[in-house]
Amino acid sequence: MHLLVLQHARIEHPGIFQKFLKEDGHSWEVVHLDEGQEIPSIDSFDGLWVLGGPMDVWQEQDYPWLKKEKAFIKMAVEEKGIPFLGLCLGHQLLAESLGGVVGKSETAEVGVMEVQLTEEGASGILFAVSYTHLTLPTMM
């Protein structure tokens, strides 16, 4: 599998994922959007990963490349059916690209949080793939 990785800041890189990808025989190409690199055609890639970053999805005036990136994500996912992984900002960009709304939370949610799964969410394919669960270890 050959992946296109969109990176928004030098410090927000693929990190440990590079080791896992290499061990499994996958290749990737990183595009540094914050450095002005252009997004290549998706046609030579098998998947799209969009990483995190310090900006917000609505800051197109400060980060003008966000508008082009959102259009690219929409095209890649809707028109081409490219598998997508979004981390932090990446999943927010996907949501907005496909018509969702992303806004600032009233309170920050950092770390492990308890969430409530809605009936609509429970019927989605993401939660139909695996019926396992985990319990986090107690911190010492």
Task: Name every feature range the model reports, one short phrase each.
Residues H133-M140:
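Single conserved hydrophobic/aromatic residue that forms the stacking wall/gate
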Residues A9, G15, T118-I125, T135:
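Secondary-structure junction/capping motif
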Residues L51-G124:
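Cysteine-nucleophile active-site neighborhood
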